[in-house]
A protein has these predicted regions:
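Residue-level recognition of tetratricopeptide repeat
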Residues: 10, 44, 78, 114, ...
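Alpha-helical linker/edge segments of TPR/alpha-solenoid repeat scaffolds
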Residues: 61-62, 91-107, 141-153
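Alpha-helical segment of the N-proximal tetratricopeptide repeat
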Residues: 7-39, 103, 107-110
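TPR alpha-solenoid repeat register
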Residues: 47, 81, 100, 134-135
């Protein structure tokens, strides 16, 4: 049995509810909302990113990475499957790509893969010099010797 397709306004409502639940640290509610979006639109890049963020907070890193990779792949469709030269946080498609890359960087960092994480953080800074995600600070932490996301200063 296929899940019922939701109307666009319901998809956007669920999507917004997912991010609101994430901000309130209500991870199971966020997961349920993002899964609801993905049941209708399995390529909704920012719902994939949201689900990746839920899994990241639950330390389900393989699942988080998979969601961020799917989100990145979906986001790149807007750019004809090529990485753009510049993105701007204020543009929704750009923001979605930044979230995917940032999520992948955080997963690498939490795993202690500092070289991979720093490379991704620097790529985010190159693409989006305004650095709305704090990638510059994360890269600086790595250069200062902080080995993982969870390491206390």
């Amino acid at each position: 049995m296929t899940p019922a397709k939701l109307p666009p306004q319901e998809i956007e409502h669920l999507y917004a509810a997912g991010w609101a639940a994430l901000q309130a640290e209500m991870l199971s509610d966020a997961e349920e909302a993002f899964l609801g979006v993905l049941a209708t639109d399995p390529h909704h890049a920012d719902a994939l990113n949201g689900l990746g963020t839920v899994y990241f907070h639950e330390k389900r890193l393989d699942e988080a990475e998979a969601m961020y990779e799917k989100g990145k792949k979906s986001a790149l469709k807007f750019f004809k499957d090529k990485m753009p030269d510049h993105v701007d946080w204020s543009a929704p498609h750009d923001r979605t790509l930044i979230r995917s890359l940032h999520g992948l960087a955080l997963v690498a960092y939490r795993r202690g893969k500092t070289a991979a994480a720093e490379k991704l953080f620097n790529e985010i800074i190159r693409l989006n010099p305004k650095d709305n995600t704090g990638a510059r600070f994360m890269a600086a932490d790595i250069r200062k010797g902080k080995k993982t996301w969870d390491q206390k200063s």
